[in-house]
């Protein structure tokens, strides 16, 4: 697994940790399978998850990175009452993790042969 990646010219790390690690306690005080720390530029992932679930979790956490790197988090804070900020952020990350593949697969179907040029460019633009 790649342990470093760049988004918006910032280097981020992915670190696997034991399932009871202090790094897996989230902002709401819950123990979870992964967290993202924008100050450390780090995603912490439980070493016990794998396969499709790991992929979903990584997409979710990388979406947090995108929200912070492109200052989308500031828009969430501007548009949401304080008590809804974290739930809205989580919902956005879940939407991409749960439905992102379907969106891009559908775009490929709609664009046909043109998708090979359009969809990868748009994906790169979103995370570069």
Regions found by a protein language model. Give the residues of each.
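Metalloprotease/metallohydrolase-associated module, dominated by Zn2+-dependent proteases
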Residues: 1-53, 72-128
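Active-site recognition of the HExxH zinc-binding catalytic motif
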Residues: 56-68
């Amino acid at each position: 697994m790649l342990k470093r990646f760049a988004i918006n010219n910032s280097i981020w790390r992915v670190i696997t940790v034991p399932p009871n690690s202090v790094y897996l306690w989230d902002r709401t005080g819950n123990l979870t399978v992964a967290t993202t720390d924008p100050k450390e530029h780090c995603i912490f992932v439980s070493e016990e998850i794998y396969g499709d679930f790991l992929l979903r979790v990584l997409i979710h956490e990388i979406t947090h990175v995108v929200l912070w790197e492109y200052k989308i988090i500031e828009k969430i804070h501007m548009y949401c009452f304080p008590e809804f900020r974290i739930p809205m952020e989580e919902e956005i990350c879940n939407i991409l993790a749960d439905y992102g593949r379907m969106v891009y697969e559908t775009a490929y179907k709609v664009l046909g042969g043109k998708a090979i040029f359009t969809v990868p460019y748009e994906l790169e633009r979103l995370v570069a």
